[in-house]
From Swiss-Prot:
Group of enzyme by EC: lyase
Taxonomic source organism: Pseudomonas putida (strain ATCC 47054 / DSM 6125 / CFBP 8728 / NCIMB 11950 / KT2440)
The organism's place on the tree of life at top rank: Bacteria
Gene Ontology cellular component list: cytosol
Protein name per UniProt: Orotidine 5'-phosphate decarboxylase
Active-site residues, record numbering mapped to chain: 64
Length: 233
């Protein structure tokens, strides 16, 4: 496997295996990792992860597990057995759920994926949180959940780049994975709390998830190269 030399993760947000692999075949595993989300995984099952690993990619399995502690821990174990590089769970599942996942991975003798917590989805603003009974700003809720994640022994968090400076200050050991990244001039789509790749890294993000600006580009390889050039300055 080619070791990835950048913090970039390209989201394979496609409905079919064929479409996802068509994009993957245009990308260099040395320049990016790839993310498999709910739609692609549901339509393609675990075979898509195996195929991407065989192509040399490190895979972020973005299924945001959220269930009772044992069920979630067993799902994380299954992901590890697939060979994924990163897997995530919802921090809102609570301390016991996250700790159960950490404990299950610690039993493994082989490589362990990075265990990442999802704080507040980047599409959510204060009024969205109020609608589910949380009368707080997104950043305040992120910090609450981050404290739980660190206590549970998580490796990092998914968060908006706008929350990254405060998170790095409060929890410097946590690795920050940031979606909602849009190169300069890109449309915002449905991601609200966004920054450019360079801005996100400067804010403290460790990994950057980029979707449509690369996946929907006329030349995805060229679009990826442009983002790499941007972050390398």
């Amino acid at each position: 496997m080619s070791a990835c030399q950048t913090p970039l993760i390209v989201a394979l947000d496609f409905p079919t295996r064929e479409a996802a692999l068509k994009l993957a075949d245009q990308l260099d595993p040395a320049l990016c990792r790839v993310k498999v989300g709910k739609e692609l995984f549901t339509s393609s099952a675990s075979g898509i992860v195996e195929t991407l690993c065989d192509k040399g990619f490190e895979v972020f399995l973005d299924l945001k597990f959220h269930d009772i502690p044992n069920t979630t821990a067993m799902a994380v174990k299954a992901a590890a057995e697939m060979g994924v590089w990163m897997v995530n769970v919802h921090c809102s599942g609570g301390l016991r759920m996250m700790a159960a996942c950490r404990e299950e991975l610690a039993k493994r003798s082989g490589p362990q994926p990075l265990l990442i917590g999802v704080t507040v989805l980047t599409s959510m603003e204060r009024e969205d949180l109020a609608g589910i009974g949380l009368d707080v700003d997104p950043q305040e809720q992120v910090l609450r959940l981050a404290a739980l994640a660190e206590k549970a022994g998580m490796d990092g968090l998914v968060c908006s780049a706008l929350e990254a400076p405060a998170l790095k200050a409060a929890h410097p050991s946590l690795q920050l994975v940031t979606p909602g990244i849009r190169p300069a001039g890109s449309a915002q789509d449905d991601q609200r709390r966004i920054l450019t790749p360079r801005q996100a890294l400067d804010a403290g993000s460790d990994y950057l998830v980029i979707g449509r600006p690369i996946s929907q580009a006329a030349d995805p390889a060229q679009a990826l190269a442009a983002v790499v050039a941007e972050i390398r300055g």
